[in-house]
Amino acid sequence: MFAQYGPLCAAVILIAIEGGLKGVGQFLASFVKLRAGFPSYAVALFLSPAIAAVLIGLNRLHGTPVPTMASLEGWQAHIVDYLRGFSHSSTGLTHFLAQTASRGRWQAALVYIGLCVADGGISEEPGWRGYAFARLYPGRRAIVASLWVWIMWAFWHTGPDFWTGIFKSDWKVLFTPITYLVVTLPLSILFAWVFIHSNGSLLPVILFHASYNATFIFVTAIWTPGKPILPPPEISLAFLITTLLVIGIGRRSLFARKSRGEGDRPV
């Protein structure tokens, strides 16, 4: 679990080298800067659930069986079981979180939300958008910078099992980076789009990543464990279509080139 915090740790170390403790302090302060407007927070929090809701509605219209709300009665137990599935963690943290979630519905909700914010939002976004994108953006178009981050982000997700397979000539593992490249392409562009409209605040993109994780896990593992309501390829396709729409709508900011030394305001 703690390996997920590699991007955050790398960003803090590099910023400390570049700007010392003052630079680190300014960087950490960007996590909670409330400089973004309401639209950024609305997109960050509600776009992912809205896409999932539309997909579920379309499936229902096409006659695909959709679980009823009554099937959510056991959501607390589903969260506990989901966490226990990671009990191999050597730190014992997931066991503690599962125990906490089992104590009541409020505890389960807080654990679930907190985990989605921490693992992905806080662990990754400071590194990928807060550091990598912020340094690739000056002198480039936003969409180009987001594509450079996309490649690094996708291959970072492959993990040690992928590289072990490569060294053992187990070529089936090549599907791992291909999968992550497909999944993270639309997300990298969408996250960058929100970030450049957030006036230097990382909070909206942290919440966006958290909202995506919470939605994805909910419809694939929590609502009906073992029987995803929405197949991951369908979700990825929906986000890709959404990204194409965003590129059309936000092409002025995504294709504008940010001058070197320019401030945090969106171009």
Description of each model-found segment:
Residues 5, 45-46, 113-118, 147-154, ...:
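Residue-level signature of the transmembrane alpha-helical core
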Residues 147, 169-234:
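Functionally important transmembrane alpha-helices
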Residues 54, 132, 187-191:
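Hydrophobic/aromatic residues in alpha-helical transmembrane segments
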Residues 123-150, 196-201:
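Membrane-interface helix/loop boundary segments of multi-pass membrane proteins
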Residues 1-121, 149, 196, 217-267:
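Specific transmembrane helices
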Residues 122, 126-127, 131, 155, ...:
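Active-site His/Glu-centered metal-binding helix of metallohydrolases
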Residues 76-98, 127-134, 161-172:
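Membrane-interface interhelical connector segments
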Residues 52, 142-161:
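Small-polar-interrupted transmembrane alpha-helices in polytopic inner-membrane proteins
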